[in-house]
C-alpha cells in the first residue's frame, strides 16, 4: 500500500486509461534537431516515463513551417517528422506511459530567425518585448491554420501518439492570443465577444476530431485566471471550459497568468504550492471531464492533498520531474526523502530563449542521470563540505572510490546555508538535507571540525587524489571601509553583525537584492521603527543572472517594501558619515545612513594544495551560481 492512494489511482481520459494521476506538462528542452526528434529527446522523455509518470505532454510542437518558436523545439508540419515521432512514442509507451503532443502556432511569439516574414497575431498588438508590430491574421490564413492543426494531430496519431494538447493559456501563441482580450481586438467573427475569441480554438478542436476520430485524446490548456486587469477572469474561463466540454475535449489543463505579467505563469521561489488550484477547483465544479492543475507541486503529499480534496483530478508536475526523473517511482515506493528537491528557481528555462538546452540547478545531468563505475578504484579526499564538495564526494563514492570529506566547520552546506536565509530561499535547506542524506546513504566518510593540514596531506592522505572545494570570500572595497559601520551581506545573513535602521546596500546582484529584501519591512506602512533601505547598483540592470520569474517577483517585493533602488549609480567616495555617488552626471550624497553593506561579489578562496593530483572545483576555481558549482563538481568527479 503506497502513501498516496489518490495520486496513484488510474484515471479514464476519454477512452484511454492512464495508470496514475502524475502528469508531466510541456517544458521546452531545445533538444530537437531542426524540428526533428533527436535521440537525446527520446531519452529525455523515456527517462520520465521509466520514472513512473502516467502521462507526458511534450514541449510545443509547431504545426506549420513559417514561424519557429524556439530553434530546438519540435515540429510536425509534414510526414517527414513521423518516423522520429514514432521513436519517441515507442520510447515512452514501453513503460506504460501515455504521450500527447502540445500542438502550437507561435504567431507573434516566433523566434526572430533570419528571413521570417512579419509575424501574425489576432490584431496589430504584440507583446512588450516585440521588436515590431505584428499584422492581423486574415480569415483565409486562419482557415489554413485550423486545417494544419488537424493534419498535425493526425501525424501524431499515425506515429502512435495518444493525443494532443491545444495550448490556449498564458496569452501564448496564436490560440492563446486569440482567446485573451489583451491581444484580441478584432471585430469580425474571431473577436469582440468571448464566443468570438474562443471560435478559433473550437474550430481547431473540430479539425482534430475530423482527422483523428473520437478515440484520440484532446486536452486544452487554459489560464484559469490571467491575473491581469483587462485579461481573462475565472468566470470567463468557467464559461470557456463548458464550451470546450461540449466540443468534445477530454480533459482541461488549468494553468494561470500570462506572458505579459512576468512571473504569473511560472511561479517563482517562495510562491505558495499549487497557486492555480483555486481555479481548477472551481472549474471542476462546472464540467464533467477531468481537470488538471499545474505549478509548484513539488512534493507528492501536495499532489495527494489536491486530488483528495477535489481541487483537481490530476496534477501536472513539471520542474520536479525534470529535477528528478524518478519522482513518481520514488513517491510510489515511499522513498520521498530520496527525491531530489526542485527549488523552483527557474534556471531550467533561463537559457532556453537564447537557444541553450534545458538544464537544472540541482540536477547537473538532466539528460542522463546514470553514474558509471570507475575502471580504476582510487582513494579520494574532498576538502570542503559546501555544495560542490558534497556533489564531488557523492559522485566519486558512487563510482566506487574510497572517499573522505573534510569540513573545517561543524556542519556541511557551506555558502548554501547563507543562501537559504533570505525570504523565499528556504527551499535551499531541502537541498542541503538531500545532499547530506546521499553522503550517508553511500557511506562517505565525513569529518567535521577538520581542517586539512600539510602534515595530513603528507602522511594520512599522501596516496589520495585531492578535490579542493574551499569556496569563496565576500569582496570588500578597502577605501570604503572608512564608513562608521560597514559589513558584508554574509555578515548580515550569518548573524555575525547586526545592521542599523538606515542602510545602504552596495550592489544590485542577487545577493544585494536578497539582503535588502531580507532587511526591509514586510510592508511599507511608514511605521517609525521600519528600516529605510537604499540599494545602489552601478549598472542599469538588477540581478542579471537571475531567472525571469524569480527576478520579477523579488523586484516587485523590493518596490512594495519601499526599498529605494538607484540604478546607474556609481559610488565615487565614502567617508565616515557620507556615501557619495554619481548618477547621470549628477553627484548625490547620502548623509543619514548608519550602515553600509557590501554585496559586490565574491573572490575565490583558493587554497594551494601541494599534492600530485589536485582538482579545484566550485567557487574556489571560479565564482558562479549554485548550478555552476554543482555542475562543475559533478563533471570533475565523473572523470576521476
Which residues fall in each region the model found?
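Rossmann-like dinucleotide/flavin-binding elements
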Residues: 301, 378-405, 448-459, 469-480, ...
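Short beta-alpha connecting loops at secondary-structure transitions
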Residues: 263-269, 290, 313, 416-424, ...
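Short gly/ser/thr-rich secondary-structure transition/capping motifs
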Residues: 2-11, 365-369, 446-451, 484-491, ...
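Flavin-dependent oxidoreductase catalytic cores
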Residues: 1-383, 387, 391, 395-398, ...
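Short, structured coil segments at secondary-structure junctions
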Residues: 287, 310-311, 442, 482, ...
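Rossmann-like dinucleotide-binding cores of NAD(P)H-dependent redox enzymes
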Residues: 402-445, 516-571
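Conserved beta-strand termini and adjacent loop/short-helix elements that scaffold enzyme active sites
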Residues: 255, 294, 363, 449-451, ...
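Hydrophobic beta-strand scaffold positions of dinucleotide-using enzymes
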Residues: 24, 252, 407, 466-467, ...
Amino acid at each position: 500500500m503506497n502513501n498516496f492512494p489518490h495520486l496513484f489511482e488510474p484515471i479514464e481520459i476519454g477512452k484511454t486509461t492512464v495508470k496514475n494521476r502524475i502528469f508531466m506538462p510541456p517544458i521546452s528542452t531545445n533538444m530537437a534537431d531542426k524540428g526533428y526528434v533527436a535521440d537525446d529527446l527520446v531519452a529525455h522523455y523515456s527517462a520520465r516515463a521509466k520514472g513512473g509518470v502516467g502521462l507526458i505532454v511534450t514541449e510545443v510542437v509547431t504545426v506549420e513551417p513559417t514561424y519557429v518558436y524556439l530553434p530546438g523545439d519540435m515540429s510536425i508540419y509534414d510526414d517527414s517528422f513521423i518516423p522520429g515521432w514514432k521513436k519517441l512514442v515507442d520510447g515512452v509507451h514501453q513503460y506504460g506511459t501515455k504521450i500527447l503532443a502540445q500542438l502550437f502556432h507561435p504567431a507573434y511569439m516566433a523566434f526572430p530567425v533570419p528571413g521570417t516574414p512579419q509575424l501574425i497575431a489576432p490584431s496589430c498588438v504584440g507583446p512588450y518585448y516585440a521588436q515590431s508590430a505584428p499584422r492581423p491574421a486574415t480569415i483565409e490564413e486562419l482557415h489554413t491554420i485550423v486545417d494544419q492543426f488537424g493534419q498535425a494531430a493526425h501525424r501524431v496519431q499515425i506515429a502512435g501518439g495518444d493525443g494532443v494538447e491545444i495550448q490556449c493559456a498564458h496569452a501564448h501563441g496564436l490560440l492563446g492570443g486569440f482567446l485573451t482580450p489583451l491581444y484580441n481586438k478584432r471585430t469580425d467573427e474571431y473577436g469582440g465577444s468571448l464566443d468570438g475569441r474562443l471560435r478559433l480554438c473550437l474550430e481547431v478542436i473540430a479539425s482534430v476530431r475530423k482527422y483523428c476520430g473520437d478515440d484520440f485524446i484532446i486536452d486544452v490548456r487554459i489560464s484559469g485566471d490571467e491575473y491581469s486587469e483587462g485579461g481573462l477572469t475565472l468566470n470567463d474561463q468557467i464559461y470557456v471550459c463548458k464550451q470546450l466540454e461540449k466540443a468534445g475535449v477530454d480533459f482541461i489543463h488549468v494553468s494561470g497568468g500570462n506572458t505579459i505579467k512576468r512571473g504569473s505563469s511560472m511561479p517563482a521561489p517562495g510562491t505558495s504550492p499549487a497557486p492555480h488550484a483555486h481555479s481548477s477547483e472551481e472549474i471542476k465544479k462546472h464540467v464533467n471531464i477531468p481537470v488538471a492543475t499545474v505549478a509548484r507541486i513539488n512534493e507528492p503529499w501536495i499532489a495527494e492533498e489536491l486530488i483528495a480534496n477535489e481541487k483537481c483530478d490530476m496534477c501536472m508536475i513539471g520542474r520536479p520531474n525534470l529535477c528528478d526523473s524518478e519522482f513518481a517511482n520514488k513517491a510510489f515506493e515511499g522513498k520521498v526523502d530520496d527525491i531530489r528537491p526542485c527549488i523552483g528557481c527557474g534556471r531550467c528555462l533561463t537559457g532556453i530563449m537564447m537557444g541553450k538546452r534545458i538544464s537544472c540547478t540541482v540536477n547537473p545531468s538532466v539528460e542522463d542521470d546514470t553514474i558509471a563505475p570507475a575502471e580504476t578504484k582510487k582513494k579520494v579526499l574532498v576538502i570542503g563540505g559546501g555544495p560542490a564538495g558534497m556533489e564531488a564526494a557523492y559522485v566519486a563514492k558512487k563510482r566506487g572510490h574510497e572517499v573522505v570529506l573534510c569540513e573545517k566547520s561543524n556542519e556541511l552546506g557551506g555558502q548554501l546555508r547563507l543562501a537559504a536565509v533570505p525570504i523565499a530561499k528556504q527551499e535551499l535547506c531541502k537541498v542541503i538535507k538531500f545532499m547530506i542524506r546521499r553522503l550517508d546513504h553511500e557511506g562517505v566518510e565525513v569529518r567535521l571540525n577538520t581542517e586539512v593540514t600539510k602534515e595530513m596531506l603528507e602522511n594520512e592522505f599522501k596516496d589520495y587524489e585531492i578535490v579542493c572545494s574551499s569556496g569563496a570570500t565576500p569582496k570588500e572595497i578597502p577605501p570604503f571601509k572608512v564608513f562608521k559601520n560597514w559589513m558584508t551581506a554574509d555578515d548580515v545573513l550569518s548573524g555575525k553583525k547586526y545592521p542599523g535602521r538606515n542602510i545602504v546596500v552596495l550592489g544590485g546582484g542577487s545577493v544585494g537584492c536578497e539582503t535588502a529584501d531580507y532587511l526591509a519591512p514586510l510592508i511599507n506602512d511608514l511605521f517609525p521603527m521600519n528600516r529605510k533601505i537604499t540599494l545602489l547598483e552601478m549598472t542599469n540592470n538588477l540581478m542579471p543572472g537571475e531567472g525571469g520569474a524569480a527576478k520579477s517577483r523579488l523586484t516587485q517585493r523590493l518596490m512594495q517594501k519601499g526599498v529605494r533602488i538607484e540604478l546607474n549609480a556609481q559610488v565615487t567616495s565614502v567617508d565616515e558619515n557620507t556615501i557619495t555617488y554619481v548618477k547621470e552626471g549628477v553627484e548625490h550624497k547620502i548623509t543619514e545612513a548608519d550602515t553600509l553593506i557590501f554585496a559586490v561579489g565574491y573572490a575565490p578562496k583558493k587554497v594551494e594544495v601541494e599534492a600530485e593530483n589536485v582538482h579545484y572545483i566550485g567557487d574556489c576555481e571560479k565564482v558562479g551560481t549554485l548550478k555552476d558549482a554543482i555542475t562543475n563538481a559533478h563533471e570533475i568527479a565523473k572523470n576521476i
